[in-house]
Amino acid sequence: MREIITLQLGQRSNYLATHFWNVQESYFTYSENEASPVDHDISFRPGIGADGSETFTPRTIIYDLKGGFGSLRQYNALYEVEENVGMPKGLWDGNEVIQRQPNIPQSEYQKALELGLPLPRLTPETVRYWSDFNRLFYHPKSIVQLNEYEMNSQLMPFEDWTVGEAFFNSLDREHDLLDRDFRPFAEECDQLRGIQLFTGTDDAWGGFAARYIDRLRDEFGKKIIWTFALESGLKTEREKQFLRAKNSAKSISEISRQSTAYVPISMPPSKLPHYVNLNIASEWYISALTSVAVESVTLPGRLRWYEGIEPWFLDNAGPQRIFALRATIRSENSELPFASHLRPNDSTQMDTDEVDHDEIEQSEQRFDLGFSPIGSATRTNNTHIFSQVQVVRDSKCNSERPERAEVGQGLTSHRLSLMTGYVPSTLSNFRSTLEFPILDSFPSDLIHEQGPAGSTLRVDAALSATSGIGRDLKNLQQTIGRRIALEEREDLINGLHELSHAYQAGWENDSDSGDD
């Protein structure tokens, strides 16, 4: 078994991850004659409930600030225990006065879910917290509330990267967070494959995540770590906008170096196609749209068919670790663009002379949803794709074999670039007939012609490392450099410059980029 442990840091991440886990639960099958195409043991852990019954809960650790969990309790129906809230006798002989904050009431959806009643339709008004549309039970050790900071506090806002960094260091000194929170899940694994991290990166959670990943690298060495770096795509006042940009720049500079794949995501995307009906005032809507792309592009790592294949690794493709996320979404009654170009594949490796460069270009053109604030620069004839993972989910697919295309005559991409100065394109394509399921916890009108709960969406999603990322990193470097304090400037600017250079070496030089 090759398990994955998920880390969820902060409110925005928990909205996205709740959609993700709801979808994973929908893949469960309950008949011996019906096998799920998804290997649930990768992301879920078996256990024993308080009454001795077997449980199966997400292999995840959820961090949020005080007030961020809504009505979700640490001990749920599976693990209900009587808590001894009194102090041990002998320590205090006086009267006890216990002060409790009032509990946040459950949503009508959660009440109906627990009682097995027909579920009411969710709306932006009834989804107050991510727990309001959650469909799963979590192990008590998965719930980690950080009481030192309160959600949406004006007195102690959790907005500055350095605040999150200092907060993690303080907690880690006192509790050793890896030993307390992470190691119990890691020790349950037969063969830990990697770590999937959802985190905010344009606020204090970026600093918290950076130091957490440092600890993970120290303890778990070369394990896969893929980071979904979530940023607010909504406009705000100028000073706060700059703080977000500075936080994002620090996160990119530090976290991407420690990640196998770093995927910056704007929530919501800056541009939306006509078929998306997005309520930008609702984190539930915004995270639902993002979840379609994220759950789809990570799907091959959970499918039984692709067991043993690492879609995140593209032949050791070199130093490009920042990937842009893009997608196209259609209802089950609509065709995906370029669907006619999907062809059956007889082998998992394509010869060099089979690489179709027109098909590479079409691969770029078919996406109409760009989630990444990095790599979103306008494509030019000089844009190069270093590597790309593409996943097509369409019930009409006539093949579920992976397809690999590489320009390089059998040499690894990294070795070829060292020998010739030219960086090849490496493309990995995965196809599955398993479409994205529409659940009753998903907004009912997000996609044009979207069907009711029980229907599906067709999805074409990709992660791409392109030379456009290098250009955007240089733009970010210039923007931050104009206003950042002198004591922070050198390390951050140099870090961004090194990252941007990885997307130019062997393809375009500094003089081509138009920078001084």
UniProtKB/Swiss-Prot annotation:
GO (cellular component) term, any one: mitochondrion
Entry keywords, A to Z: Mitochondrion
GO biological process, one term: mitochondrion organization
Gene3D superfamilies assigned to the protein according to its UniProt record, in alphabetical order: Tubulin/FtsZ, GTPase domain
InterPro entries (alphabetical): DML1/Misato, DML1/Misato_tubulin, Misato_II_tubulin-like, Tubulin/FtsZ_GTPase_sf
Cellular location(s): Mitochondrion
CDD domains: misato
One Pfam match: Misat_Tub_SegII
Family, as annotated: Belongs to the misato family.
Function field: Involved in the partitioning of the mitochondrial organelle and mitochondrial DNA (mtDNA) inheritance.
The protein, known as: Protein DML1
Organism annotation: Coccidioides immitis (strain RS) (Valley fever fungus)
